[in-house]
Every structure is written in structure tokens, then in C-alpha cells.
Amino acid sequence: MKLNRADIKRYFDKEEMISAFSIIYPLLRKHWKSYAGLMLFLLTDILITLASAWFLGDLSDAAVQGDFTRVKHLLPLAFGLILISFLTIYCDTYIEAVATSSIKRDLKEQLLRQLLLSPVHKIHTTHSGELISHFTNDINSIDGMIGRNLINLIKLPLLFIAIFLYLAHISPLLSFVGLFIIPIAVIAGGVFGFLLRNSSREILKLNSEMTSSLSEIFQGFIVIRSFLLERSFFSKYRQQNQQALGLDLYNGKMKGLFYAGGEAIALIAFLVSLCLGAVIVSKGMLTVGSLLAFVTLSNRLIYPLNGLAGQWAAFQRSTSAVERIAPILKVQYETTDFPEFSQKKPKQKAIGFQNMTFSYDGERYIFENFNLQIPAGKSIAIVGASGAGKSTLFNLLQGFYQPQAGEIYIDQTPLSALTASELQNLIAYVPQETFLFTGTIRENLLLANPQTTEEELVTAARAAHIHDFILSLPHGYETKIGEKGVTLSGGQKQRIAIARAILKNAPILLLDEATSALDNETEYLVKEALQGIMKNRTTIVIAHRLSTIQNVDSIIVIDNGKLIQSGKHEELIHQPGLYRDLAHINPSQLSHNEERAIML
């Protein structure tokens, strides 16, 4: 793994670590009782370590001196230490699990809330696999900042100090051996933590890319099969997987070197202490029991330093994970409340686009000084070539994107003055690509209006001409439709989406090629249903079929972000212009009542 100056600078960047900890700290504070308990058990564990060494030394001296009365008195203490140790380990482990699991739960909910409140363009410009990776790889990698590791960052220095002071109490001369261990362990731990943090950052990034690859494979499985792309996608994933293996092996190698080196240092300290101690014992300056207690503790003296370096490396690894989700969590929104559904909706709303200018990237403008007025309760169809901006108008009207200049009005109120709840309650939308959620047909329909009665549900389904089909299924409205409605045809999904829009009962209706997936017979039936719900509602239609748009109040034609034609179908089809060009129809051959599909 190549390291550069930026990696080294980042490792010692206090602001970066403080920034990451500022995200975690409120969650730690929320569960302070659990961490207070962990601190109590931390101190208890240190006392048990020292008490065990004292017990071993005292028991050894009693045995050497033949003081069996003392031995008998010490045995109950041994069982007491075992019991306290058992309870400490059990409670400590359980409370740690409660704390870490609760914090991960809270963090996942906080992350999802932020994403659900995010502007649509931020979600659209981020790969779904990367977003999912935040909830899996990243959050599952923060243990180093919230779990046992965090407690050990406090415990291990205290344990080292306690052991060193106790060793100095037993033999000041021998305790100096431990002083030589400190600089070696600290330097080794710093290097280890630096290397592990950088490789961990690369692993998290690579895991995100692999999750994205898998997401694309499963979502585009039909295309992969149709175009014989199995080998290509498998090779891409295998290459990523091999890179991940290389990084994991690198981490394993570094850990092996570090822990093996730590054990070697501990063994050297043990042998030196044992040899020097034997000399001191032979001169009567130390008892055998004291030497045994010293050697036992000196062997553990390396553990806090060795462990501290490892825990610090884990902390750094967790910092890398928090860095990846920090940009999402730190965004401040005007409200943290989700939009709420409202039953009370006015029946008619006028729409206005006034001198509106919009660009997705700030360079290529989709609309420049665009103006359009739609009277309340009227219906219009938008026609234009691919890329003219038809769907962009829908995105702007729903508040998914904001214009760079100008304003969009509903009645006389600017969109910017409406809350998300107010705006979304005014609009029912049937997208070009129908999306149904995993669950039953009933659950998908009720998403539009949770307070829908059974009668209203059936009425909407009948209006969309989907009721009879639903009843023909073995479980009717309780039929599970699979992921994205995979068990249904395109037309069936489209009609469920239309029924869902009917149930929302909003004053503004947006139909983005809402009948594109229907056959001619079903389209005729749905067209009748749409004509019914379009009455007294302001409706905007994007369509490719003549039958869908010929009965609207007005058709507008846009090209390069400008309104270039408007009028009824009968007028526009006989006028030279883009509308007639897109229709590919000779006006002299078109009868007034023909129901012919045209490409618009």
C-alpha cells in the first residue's frame, strides 16, 4: 500500500478526529448510564488483576513457609475473586452489547432520517450501493469509537499505571525493566495505527464500490442476461474482490507483526525480570512469592501498551468510517419532521412558471426565462422531443429541484414558501416508470392515503380498471407482489399506480406517460378513468399517444427550454411546426375521430 504526505498529515489531523467524535459524542451521552456502568466494571477489573497477583504471591510465600493455616484462610478469598470476576465479565459484556447495539440503532435511524430529508438531487447523484454501504459497512465499523475499544482506551493506561506502581511497590529495582518497554511499545503502536487506518479507509471505499456493483447486477439482471454480460460483470466484481483480499491480507500481516513483536517484548521482559529476580531472591532481598507476583504482573505490563496501540488503531479505523457518513449527518435542514398526509385538500389550483431558469449542472440550461400559466382545473399536455425538459418540469413543480432564477407558483403562492407537507399534499403523481414496494397490493394502494376506507379502495381500483384483476388473484388485495411488483405485468403495475394516485385525491395531477405500459384495450378503459379524475383538477400530461392527449384543454410544445406552440390537437396537427413533425402524420390523412398512436 502506497503512503504519501497527505496520508501522514491526515493521521495527525486533530480536527478530523474531533469532527468524527462530535458526531458520536451525543450518542454516547444519550447512553451515559451504560458507560458509567462500564467504567465501574473497568475499575473492578483492574482491582481484580492486582488482587490476583497479590493472592498468588501471598499463597506462594505461605506454601514455601509451610503456613497451611494461612493457605486455608486464602482459599475462600480465591473463590470470592473468581465469583467477582465472573459477575464483572458477564455484566461488562452485556452492558457493552446494550450500549453499542443501541448506538448503532440510533445512528442508522439518524442517517436514514437525514437521507429522507435530503433534496432529491443528492439522492439521484449518489449510487444506491454507496448509500446502502453506509448502513452496513460503515456503521458496523464504528465499534472502535463506541464499544469495548473506547473503554479500553481509558482502561489500558490506568491498568499500566496500576501495574507499574504495584511492581514498584514490590521491587523498585526490578520495576525499572518496565520503563524500557514504554518507548518501544508506543512507537510500534503509532506506526501500526497509522498503517491500519489508511488501509481501513481503502477497504471501506472498496466495500462501497462492491456493494454498488452487486446492486447494479441484481437490478439489471435481465439486461445482463440479454446482452451476455455475465462474464464482464463477474470479472469486474472478482477484480474488486481480489483487491479487498489484498488489503485484508495486508492488515493481517501488519497485525501479525505487531502482536508477534509485542509478545516477543513481553517474553524478553519476563526473562529479564525472572533472571534479575532470582539473583535478588538469592540475596534475601525478595521473597519467592513476591518474585512470582512480580513476574506474573510484569508479563502483563506489555499488554496495556500493546493493547493500547491496537485499540488506537481500531479507533482510527472507526474514524475513517465516521468520516464517510459525516457529510450526510452534518447537514442542517429547516425541519427535522417528515411531511404529513392531509385529508383536507382544495379541489382546484392554478400553476404558474414565471421567468424560470434552470440547469442541472450550472452550465447547460434546460429552461431560460420560461413562462407558462395553467388555469385552475384545466388540463394541458406537454409535447416535445426527447431531452426537451418535459420530465424536468415535473421535478421542478414537485420541489425536487429549485430553479436558479424566476419562480414557480401554485395559485399566488411561490413554491419556496410552501412546506414539503403542503406541497406534496397538493400533487398526485403517476411516474413513467412505476415503482411498487415489496408487500401486498392493499399496502401499496394505502400508501396514497392511510385513512382510506374499503369502499374508497375498491372504487379507486374500479376506476383504474384493476379491481377485477385483483379479485382474480388467489389472495385478492392481500396478494404479495414481490420486489418492485415483479409478479405483475407492466400494465398491471401501471393501473395500480393510477389507482394509488386516485386515492391521494390531490388537486394537481401529474401524469408522466401514465398509459405507456398499457395495451390498446386497457388504455381505452384507463383513459376513461383518467378523464373522470381529471375533472376539476389541474392536470399536466406527458404522453406519447394521441389518445392520451387529444381531449386535454390545451397542448403546449416545448423545444430547447422554450414554449414554441400551444393549442388544441386539431389546431396544431394542421399547422407546420414541431408538433406535426413529431407526429409523423400527414394532416390530410387524419380524420377527426381516429384513435391512432403517434410518437411525440
PLM segments and residue spans:
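Membrane-integrated ABC transporters
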Residues: 1-48, 64-77, 92-96, 100, ...
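Short intracellular "coupling" helices and adjacent cytoplasmic loop segments at the cytosolic face
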Residues: 2-14, 101, 109-133, 137-139, ...
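An intracellular "coupling" helix at the cytosolic face of ABC transporter transmembrane type-1 domains
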Residues: 29-30, 120-121, 137-146, 150, ...
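Transmembrane helices of ABC transporter permease
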Residues: 30, 34-45, 58, 76, ...
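Hydrophobic alpha-helical segments in the permease module
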Residues: 78-89, 182-189, 255-269, 288-310
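Cytoplasmic juxtamembrane "membrane-exit" helices immediately C-terminal to transmembrane segments
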Residues: 94-98, 102, 106, 169, ...
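Cytosolic ends of transmembrane helices, especially the final helix of ABC transmembrane type-1 domains
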Residues: 229, 253, 301-328
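ABC-type nucleotide-binding domain
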Residues: 344-600
